[in-house]
Amino acid sequence: MGYQRKETGGQERRIKLYYFSWLANKTGRESEELVLPPSVTTVTELLDLLRKRRYQIAQAFDESLLRPTVNKQFAEFFTRLEDGDEVALVPNRPTPPATPDI
């Protein structure tokens, strides 16, 4: 999936982001809509952005803890993000990392 996507050319891209399991509890929401800055083109860069925006729970966005999906298909972290994508972050272990309660 990641290889088949094209570069966006600097257009504004909106995605729908879903959180599951303990990640929904840590973030306090099950989903949100984001407008991606031009610097965020892949799932890895999205996780970097989330770590910066939610620095109190940055450990929760570690790649080793999550399995991403893009448009309901499991995806690699290098998968490019396009306008209208649905991205889900699914924890790959049942217990969350230790982070301060918010």
Predicted features, each with a name:
Residues 1-102:
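Ubiquitin-like/PB1-type beta-grasp interaction modules and other compact soluble beta-rich domains
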